[in-house]
Amino acid sequence: MSIEEKIQLIEKGTLEVIDTEELKEVLKKEQPIAYTGYEPSGKIHLGHAVTVQKLKTLQKLGFKIKILLADFHAFLNGKGSIEEIAETAEYNMKCFKALGLDETTEFILGSSFQLNEDYASKVYKLATLTTLKRARRSMDQVSRHDENPKVASVVYPIMQTVDMVALDVDVALGGMEQRKIQMLARENLEKIDEKVPVCIHTPLLHGLDGDAKMSSSKGNYIAVDDSVEEITKKIKKSYCPQGETEGNPMIEIAETFVYPNQETLLIKRPEKFGGDIELTHEQLINDFSNGDLHPMDLKNGIKDFLIEHFAPVREYMEE
């Protein structure tokens, strides 16, 4: 596979790659390193699965995958005690394995290296180069809204920057909520003569309630290990306004998970409502926009797909 073909695969389903010319150079390496960091703070849901899909693509293209289980970051972001976060990290790691990342994937706890002398030295150095305003702005979409923010909220993005050095990262992957932090990292790492990673950003899924972001803290998610009953209940109650495709979580799930994996979505219906249909992406958008596909029929199709698609995850988690 040529470098151009690899880039096309990497760009598919992403919002941006910063930047493509740098990525070309990275792809010339024998085994470049790609990483994503996750706060161990709750259930692993479809929002996480978006980035895991891309990690699996990178893995197939020869990347070494490192997943940072950012326990100290979760603590700084008020997600629980160190003990609670450690327990969640174990569960999260099992979920990521269940999603199909292979045995070469390296899982790393932030606390395993973030107290090292060299790491701390770089954090202090970057703290002298980063304005308070810039650090706080980078956290806009990552931390909870707080009218009286803690100092921890500005230490967080500086640590995330140094993580990229400590893990020897060539590619940093994250959802769009990570963009401001990653742009800060690119600027600051250049200032201290460290390797600047390529940054890849994936789209955020709307919550099942129509909120701008699917989040475990808001409860508006489908967990990758949800039971058949839980998936059915959550999809039935989900936001799916008739005729609207923008910001519709059912359409987003179809675009993010169904069509990258199969050509059509099967929607089972009683004969009196037209019988079963299989829709391509284009047909789905047209039929739903025109009112020819009822929201409940779309929900049922998405529900059936998710139940089948994540069956291996449920089985793995039950072992």
From Swiss-Prot:
Q: What GO CC terms are in its UniProt record?
A: cytoplasm
Enumerate the residues binding L-tyrosine: Y35, Y156, Q160, D163, Q178
Q: Where is this motif: 'HIGH' region?
A: 40-48
The first-level EC class reads ligase
- Record-listed E.C. numbers: 6.1.1.1
Q: InterPro entries from the entry?
A: aa-tRNA-synth_I_CS (IPR001412), aa-tRNA-synth_Ic (IPR002305), Rossmann-like_a/b/a_fold (IPR014729), Tyr-tRNA-ligase (IPR002307), Tyr-tRNA-ligase_3 (IPR023684), Tyr-tRNA-ligase_arc/euk-type (IPR023617), Tyr-tRNA_synthase (IPR050489)
Coiled-coil residue spans: none
The record's subcellular locations are:
Cytoplasm
A Pfam family it matches: tRNA-synt_1b
Q: Where does ATP bind?
A: S216
One GO MF term, please? ATP binding
Question: Keyword set for this entry?
Answer: Aminoacyl-tRNA synthetase, ATP-binding, Cytoplasm, Ligase, Nucleotide-binding, Protein biosynthesis
Where can the motif 'KMSKS' region be found? 213-217
Query: A GO BP term, please?
Result: tyrosyl-tRNA aminoacylation
State the reactions this protein catalyses.
tRNA(Tyr) + L-tyrosine + ATP = L-tyrosyl-tRNA(Tyr) + AMP + diphosphate + H(+)
The record's function comment reads:
Catalyzes the attachment of tyrosine to tRNA(Tyr) in a two-step reaction: tyrosine is first activated by ATP to form Tyr-AMP and then transferred to the acceptor end of tRNA(Tyr).
- List the HAMAP family: Tyr_tRNA_synth_type3
Q: How does it assemble?
A: Homodimer.
Q: Which family does it belong to?
A: Belongs to the class-I aminoacyl-tRNA synthetase family. TyrS type 3 subfamily.
**What protein does this entry describe?**
Tyrosine--tRNA ligase
Native source species: Methanobrevibacter smithii (strain ATCC 35061 / DSM 861 / OCM 144 / PS)
